[in-house]
Amino acid sequence: MSGHRFQALEYEPAFLSLGEQYWDKVQAATFPQHILRFRNDALLPLMGLDPAEVTDADFIAAFGQFQGREPFLAMRYHGYQFGEYNPHLGDGRGFLYGQFRGVDGQLYDLGTKGSGTTPYSRGGDGRLTLKGGVREVLASELLHRLGVRTFRSLSLVETGESLWRGDEPSPTRSSVLVRLGRSHIRFGTFERLHYLRRPDLIQRLLDHVIAYYYPHLLEIPDPKERNCAFYRELVARTADLAAQWLVAGFCHGVLNTDNMAITGESFDYGPYAFLERYDLGFTAASFDYYGRYAYGNQPAICAWNLEKLQIPLSWVIPLEEMAAALKTFGDRCQTTYLKLMLKRLGWADLPLELGRSLVVETQAFLSRSLISYPQFFISLRQEFSPEWAADVGHLFSGSPTLTPADQKLLEAWKRCYFERLQQATPPQRVAIPQTLRAANPLVIVTRPHIEQIWQAIDQEDDWSRFRATLELMQV
């Protein structure tokens, strides 16, 4: 086998070293074709690689042909799926490709999706549709641009197979996606060990998680207090993540406990959707018949999942300590939401007591009007001017697309925003355009837009819309 640049990384067998109770060694599938459709050069410096020196052939050799990297690990886990416990889970169409230290000193995972069957494929083909890969690239990169903690997409390789799926026109094209994130360890990784009644393995896994992903907690000498501090921080990270999703207008779709990362990152959001309109009851998954994972219910579900995680962790952390920590979830999520929503509105340092009314007014306008959720923030970024502070009539004066009813609803919002501008100092007003640019990309990735991108790829093999969308995210 010929070498490739990704073999030069110093891979660290952190998860492998936990022992075979946590994983199965697997092999990658062999594919008839390898076409690199996406490479994320922005991630290569983190890996200590120079994008100019990494060729497309390097990506294909590493993440299409899987040369020179073994063993690959299918991770074992269980999970609560739509509220019901399922002990028949695990990596079914991907594996842990390898772990490495970034130039920042932190441990990162490379994981695949669509790379072949594993012991947990449950009758599936272990493949990922090309459309599914395109969707995940778009989601992960937009989430990152919006400031949401998420796994990133490193590469997407089309693999030349025809796949049959019940939820999209078939046959359809195949792909392998490679993701980069802190850890694939899930809430469900712990839940499986409780199911097996192995508190020793739970403690070993928790020690591993703290050492690699919460290393600052190692300064706490008492192991019991260290474990408690871990759960408290996980609650805070998860509350922040739920708030980030709400502000981004993102609906994960399937927030089962096996899709919750122990590091507080977004991943495994297959049927996701970004809001078209602000609707707390919106559900992304067609099979979510009762709206369990609705957009507005995501904080409550995250808290529910954290509560379920208390069951396996109760072997090593007192329940009363975890219950007390979980009570802080709501306030933490709400505070983070207010701060982040104010940034989307242009206010980086507005005190919450002054900004709360503006956020409430924004929610009221967006929920009652027909305006697009992402377009509202794009318009705010494009139209804002410091001159708005001179006259309320200047606000959104260039928005002829609003209906008369929506224009009336907007008046209350404009008065509230104008009041904030009147109270702001000149430096605060000058900083608003920069804050708006940082918080609001000029791109929309709702389902109709994704469908347009996919139709061009599927019918004409035209990737220009896909590439243009990714480029626009950086503006």
Curated annotation (Swiss-Prot):
Keywords: ATP-binding, Magnesium, Manganese, Metal-binding, Nucleotide-binding, Nucleotidyltransferase, Transferase
Any GO MF annotation of the entry: ATP binding
Names of required cofactors: Mg(2+); Mn(2+)
Residues annotated as catalytic: D258
Keyword check for Metal-binding: yes
EC number of this enzyme: 2.7.7.-, 2.7.7.108
Source domain of life: Bacteria
InterPro entries (alphabetical): SelO
Keyword Cell division tagged: no
Reaction equations catalysed: L-seryl-[protein] + ATP = 3-O-(5'-adenylyl)-L-seryl-[protein] + diphosphate; L-threonyl-[protein] + ATP = 3-O-(5'-adenylyl)-L-threonyl-[protein] + diphosphate; L-tyrosyl-[protein] + ATP = O-(5'-adenylyl)-L-tyrosyl-[protein] + diphosphate; L-histidyl-[protein] + UTP = N(tele)-(5'-uridylyl)-L-histidyl-[protein] + diphosphate
A Pfam match: SelO
Binding residues annotated for ATP, in chain numbering: G90, G92, R93, K113, D125, G126, R179, R186, D268
Binding residue positions for Mg(2+): N259, D268
EC class: transferase
Protein family membership: Belongs to the SELO family.
Matches recorded under HAMAP family: YdiU_SelO
Function per UniProt: Nucleotidyltransferase involved in the post-translational modification of proteins. It can catalyze the addition of adenosine monophosphate (AMP) or uridine monophosphate (UMP) to a protein, resulting in modifications known as AMPylation and UMPylation.
Record's protein name: Protein nucleotidyltransferase YdiU
Organism the protein comes from: Thermosynechococcus vestitus (strain NIES-2133 / IAM M-273 / BP-1)
